[in-house]
Amino acid sequence: MEMLSGAEMVVRSLIDQGVKQVFGYPGGAVLDIYDALHTVGGIDHVLVRHEQAAVHMADGLARATGEVGVVLVTSGPGATNAITGIATAYMDSIPLVVLSGQVATSLIGYDAFQECDMVGISRPVVKHSFLVKQTEDIPQVLKKAFWLAASGRPGPVVVDLPKDILNPANKLPYVWPESVSMRSYNPTTTGHKGQIKRALQTLVAAKKPVVYVGGGAITAGCHQQLKETVEALNLPVVCSLMGLGAFPATHRQALGMLGMHGTYEANMTMHNADVIFAVGVRFDDRTTNNLAKYCPNATVLHIDIDPTSISKTVTADIPIVGDARQVLEQMLELLSQESAHQPLDEIRDWWQQIEQWRARQCLKYDTHSEKIKPQAVIETLWRLTKGDAYVTSDVGQHQMFAALYYPFDKPRRWINSGGLGTMGFGLPAALGVKMALPEETVVCVTGDGSIQMNIQELSTALQYELPVLVVNLNNRYLGMVKQWQDMIYSGRHSQSYMQSLPDFVRLAEAYGHVGIQISHPHELESKLSEALEQVRNNRLVFVDVTVDGSEHVYPMQIRGGGMDEMWLSKTERT
């Protein structure tokens, strides 16, 4: 039997779990693990410049691949710096395992140097936290951590490791468990047959049905089953911000994103529907607006693997607890047996109404402006990448422009902080994606506010040769804050103008990368093409685009209104 120290057990456990990359930053409490990483080998470690970025990188990897991202940080400030990244992953149900160092067990509770209660601090934003107290427990705890992170509704798991249990002088037998189970945790994956049959019958009988798809559909990997179901029943589809890509955006039945900045046709279809078939969604406030006015005539069918998400905000008339992929497979089997296809004549009038809403062309903008419109930047990017890039974003107007003007036809291509809305997410997430998928085109869409939250990771990108394209929509404002101030606060721009911005091109060059400035509309196509060519030649390129600072994101739902109440421009509302 192999004899290993606690630190060596950590590394061997990661290897036995199939982990290839770890993102982290060393410190006193985890130096034994870092020494084991060096001596044992087998794992690529990415040395970040800030622990928050380490978590975002692991998060980006997890979103793009479906694998569990792994982070290693030291105790005290190393652990607390990771919290924002952990909370970001928690809100979006992303599987992570975060290994945090801790002071020796004999010092816990005595305010030792770099001590903090990581289990207590992280508890509200993790799926589970472990404090490992004995060296021999390390393999079993890590096996449980990965299983918890990836199963059911995924999420981050923290494993807190006191320094003394990692002692390289203390060797114990290493046994990697073949399987793991937890008596109090057994997520339901197969849907109830009776409920599925009721849901299908309700869908077939509907006159104004709509399918509402969220991030849970991407997690479940049900895009093919979803497409087959939707096409068989001729159903219109809307997606949440997190669900973009679960159903092809260029498909004729796709109506785009719904919610606060959703398309006119998506929001109107939701509001007027008589049946809503919700797949892997939370019905969060950014998609419902005023619950008292929400979809007043709709029967709600809701599939979700997390029973606590069903009827939490919107009551489900037919709840189905289970994995979305398995439930849709069950539904397709039932559909084939009963041949219960939606007669086209039954919802022809509904589709005619939807096409009238679609004809409103809610995403049109001024294409002849002398200033660069942010919408044009995203559309050009989509065209030049043939819609096949992995796109990460930060948070703000640029995030909404990317969501609306870059149609995603594949899952896991759109990577953003939807729930927590974390500025500074985009760049490190892009680096995590590129680390996992080196042959793919990876683009970070950001803004002059967000990019400065984690811009130090340009150094990490250089060290590990991670050629991504960074597109900075520079409007010299905190754009979304300014938009709200324009619309709600009578144009009082309190602390939303970004003074003393750096020269981003020269800053990128100082970090060892290529910087490109775009200031005029006629430069957009050629310089973005040049940037993508440089990326293909293994260079990170930072493109600073001077965009129209007065531009707003539309549509925008009216605060306190129903799904059908929107601003379509600065002067037009429904």
Curated annotation (Swiss-Prot):
Disulfide bonds: none annotated. Residues 397-477 are annotated as: Thiamine pyrophosphate binding. SUPFAM superfamilies: DHS-like NAD/FAD-binding domain, Thiamin diphosphate-binding fold (THDP-binding). Binds 1 Mg(2+) ion per subunit. One of its GO terms (cellular component) is acetolactate synthase complex. Thiamine diphosphate binds at E51. GO terms for molecular function: acetolactate synthase activity; flavin adenine dinucleotide binding; magnesium ion binding; thiamine pyrophosphate binding. Transmembrane segments: none annotated. Keywords: Amino-acid biosynthesis, Branched-chain amino acid biosynthesis, FAD, Flavoprotein, Magnesium, Metal-binding, Thiamine pyrophosphate, Transferase. One of its GO terms (biological process) is isoleucine biosynthetic process. Pathway: Amino-acid biosynthesis; L-isoleucine biosynthesis; L-isoleucine from 2-oxobutanoate: step 1/4; Amino-acid biosynthesis; L-valine biosynthesis; L-valine from pyruvate: step 1/4. Dimer of large and small chains. E.coli contains genes for 3 AHAS isozymes: ilvBN, ilvGM and ilvIH. Belongs to the TPP enzyme family. This is Acetolactate synthase isozyme 3 large subunit.
